[in-house]
A protein has these predicted regions:
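Alpha/beta-hydrolase fold nucleophile elbow
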Residues: 68-80
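The alpha/beta-hydrolase serine catalytic core
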Residues: 91, 95-185
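Glycine-rich His-Gly loop
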Residues: 1-4, 80, 168
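Aromatic pocket-lining residues of Rossmann-like dinucleotide-binding sites
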Residues: 22, 89-90
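Glycine-rich nucleophile elbow surrounding the catalytic serine of serine-hydrolase chemistry
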Residues: 78-88
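Glycine-rich "HGGG/HGxG" loop immediately N-terminal to the catalytic nucleophile
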Residues: 33-47
Length: 185
């Protein structure tokens, strides 16, 4: 699962490279664009964390339906906000996921949005305008309203299997404290 504002290939094609390396080792992978991002239909402005969790659950069901997939070996990988989404999908579907890989997970996107901050940008006018401008993209009011209702750590805590956390201590987008908190739960 990709980060906030990115597509299935991610910055510098990091997910495309990961998919190639997995394939070389005989491991199938699925990359996709969430609704409203990349080549997918929909508007970015309509995206919420909950809608991305729903997309993630649908992708998990799709992967489970593939004849060549060993259902006991399905793992989920997420980067940045995609790590937050991946952790929530894994928490909601613990029985269907054998492992979780999180690269610099960023549930702080959700928690900071409760204070009308988005990736370090003050979006306190989101209710007045109905959207926030973030690096030229419109983030809809629904994203803020959805964030008010979510507790990603509580959902992720329901996942009981292996988790691989990778996080740099100089990450300026996602605080290392996010991974430290995931480690605690």
């Amino acid at each position: 699962f990709r980060g906030f504002c990115d597509g299935r290939n991610e910055i510098n094609f990091v997910h495309a490279g990961l998919s190639r390396r997995l394939c070389e080792r005989g491991i199938a992978s699925v990359r996709f664009d969430f609704a409203g991002s990349g080549d997918s239909d929909g508007r970015f402005e309509d995206m919420t964390v909950s809608s991305e969790v729903e997309d993630g659950l649908a992708i998990l069901d799709y992967v489970k339906s593939l004849d060549f997939v060993d259902q006991s070996r399905i793992a989920i990988h997420g980067l940045s906000m995609g790590g937050c989404v991946a952790s929530m999908v894994a928490g909601l579907r613990d029985a269907d996921v054998c492992a979780l890989s999180l690269w610099c997970p960023a549930p702080d996107v959700v928690y900071n949005m409760k204070h009308k901050m988005l990736c370090g940008v003050d979006v306190s006018d989101i209710e007045e305008k109905g959207y926030a401008d973030y690096e030229g993209l419109r983030v809809g009011l629904g994203f803020y309203q959805d964030a008010l209702e979510l507790d990603p750590y509580a959902v992720a805590a329901k996942f009981t299997k292996r988790v691989n956390l990778v996080h740099g201590d100089e990450d300026v987008t996602a605080s290392i404290h996010c991974s430290e908190r995931y480690k605690e739960i």
